[in-house]
Amino acid sequence: MQEIESYKHYANKWEFDTIFFGGGTPSLLPAKYLNKILEKLHSIFDISNVKEITLEANPGEASLNHLRDIKSLGVNRLSMGFQSFNNHILKLLGRLHKSEDCFKTFHNARKAGFDNINTDMIFNIPGLSIKSWKKDLSKLIELNPEHISAYSLTVEPSTKLFNLVKNKELLMPIEKIDVEQFLITEDILSNEGYKHYEISNYAKKNKECKHNLNYWKLSPYLSFGPSAHSYDLKKRWWNIRSLEKYINQISKKKNPIEDYEILTKKDHYNEIILNGLRLSSGINLLDLNGYDKQNIDKIDKKWDCVSVSNNKIKLTNNGFLFVDEITQDLFI
C-alpha cells in the first residue's frame, strides 16, 4: 500500500487497462484486503479504463464464498495453476494440491460467476507419456476454460526436481517427446476452438489475456511488491527480492527498488524481436526502426517456417519450435 502511495506524484504519467494479482498465492488474501488494494489504486491512479482484473488462484486455496467475494470486487478473470491432473506428477512438481482440487476450485469459480478462467498446464515432465498428456488435455477440454497456458517444463535450480535430474535419479524426456507433446497440444486445442495466439497460450474467441499481451507488445507496466519489475519504455527497474528487506525499506519510507537499467535503441529493437516472435500475429516491421531488409530476406529464405509479407514477419506453428534460433538470427 505504501509503495503504491509513493507513486502519487507520477500518477498522471501512467494509464492502465489491466490489473493482475499474481506472484505467489493472492487467492489466500482475504477479500477485504484485496478491496483495500483496489481502493488505493483507484485513489492514486486513473483506472477507469481497466477492463481486465486477473487474480491467480491455486487449486484448493479458494472457497466458493471467497471466490464470490472477490468477484463482487470487480475481479473478472481467474488464472489457476493446475499443472497436471496426475497426482504422482503433481507431487513430483512439488505442488500441494491434488487432481480433485483442480475440479473443485474450477467448478466453484463457475458457481461464483466467473466466465473468464485460465488454466496453466505443463508437459515435457519426467514420466509423462504422450498418452497421459492427451488424457490431461481431454480432461481439461471437458472443463472448457476460456484460456489455456501450456508450458514445456523448465527445471529450476535449487528445487527437488532439479537435484533429482542432476543426480540422474530422474531423466528428462528426449527432445522428440517435448516436440510431439507441443504439436499435440496445438492440434487438439485448435480443433476445440482455441486460438494459438502465443507460443504457450491458447484462447477462445476474444478471451486472449490482455495483461500478457501488453507485456509481449512492450506496453509500459507498473508492479508492486518484492521482486516486482516495472517498465516505462525507457528503462526497467525491479524491487528487492527478500520479503524481509522489502518490508524493512517500506517501513522506513524508503524506496524498495534494488536496481534499474536504461534501455538503448539496440535493447528496444531486440526486445521487439524477442517478444513479438512469440505471438502468432508476429511483428510489424515498421516498428523496427532501421531494420535490415537484406537480413530479413535472408532469414525468410533460410527458414521455411518464417513468413514475411505486408511489412509483417511471423512464425508458423512449427516455427515456434525454433523461435530461439530465429530470434538470434534477427538480433542486432
PLM feature spans:
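A short, conserved structural fragment
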Residues: K302-N311
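C-terminal scaffold of the Radical SAM
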Residues: M1-Y10, W14-N289
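Minor-groove-contacting beta-hairpin "wing" of winged helix-turn-helix DNA-binding domains
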Residues: K312-T316
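Short amphipathic alpha-helical interaction segments
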Residues: N289-W303
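Intrinsic-disorder/low-complexity regions
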Residues: K135, L286, S309-N310, Q328
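Short, amphipathic alpha-helical interaction segments positioned at domain boundaries
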Residues: N318-I332
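Short phosphate-engaging motifs
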Residues: P157, N295, F322
